[in-house]
Amino acid sequence: NTPAFNMAVPTPGEAQTIYLWEEGKMPCPREYSSSWNDPEDFKPHMEYRPVKKGVEVKGAVMLCAGGAFVFRGNWGDTYPTADKLNELGYQCFVVQYRLRPFTQEEGALDLARAVRYVRYYADEYDIDPNDIAVVGYSAGGILCGEQVLNWKGDVTPAALDENYIPDTLDLVSADSAAIGHIYSFYGRLSVGSTDVEKFRQSNLPPTFYAYGTEDPFYHQFMANADAVREAGVSVEEHCYEGQPHGFGAGNKNSDWVPEFDRWLTDIYENN
């Protein structure tokens, strides 16, 4: 029999921190050393940021900050975006995933676990279980891409860690209805993929891009979006003139959140 999972019960409407792995059950544990970018007692978790009271719930959005996998830039990326999305009807979950020396695969397992949890408790969060999107900024978007490419559906952490024992939460799909790449792409750190065949075989969800022309990865973003589009995936692309890397929730010259809301609302309504 598959062992039952044991995690915090949701507190809908009230902010909450939810730890993703039970003690001793996190896939791919490593010996702690001083070279780590998180403290020894760090545990992957997500922060639930509820829809504003009185606002109709549209669905859920998982948010993963950038930071080159050496820090999580939540104050510039995820927190201000969550504030905007909460007012627009989205239950937001800021995922505090593992950093170096863990790999983007292990970080993607943290995100997949978070997606499964939100889907399992969809009724409590007043969402349709299909209406879950993942959004990442820079390295956080690379992590989201890793998750939707390789750690979706019924793929469990046992595919990466042979010692991992799946629990009942692993029986829940880790699929997403959409992905947002905010100054990011499918690939690895600093290297966007243009593997059309991989994208085609992966049955990617609709993909949203927002980036600026002054970003050092500007041409890689364009090439990545073109390859994803060539693979037959629905792509929404917003390029902001003169904008650099790291504009977070946007400004008057990179106001991507309303565009994302319009796009995602249509996806959720037609799920």
Could you say what each language-model-derived stretch is?
Residues 187-188, 213-219:
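Acidic catalytic loop of the alpha/beta-hydrolase fold
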Residues 208-211:
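Short beta-strand/loop motif that positions the catalytic acidic residue
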Residues 73-75, 80, 95-129, 249-255:
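Catalytic nucleophile-loop/oxyanion-hole region of alpha/beta-hydrolase
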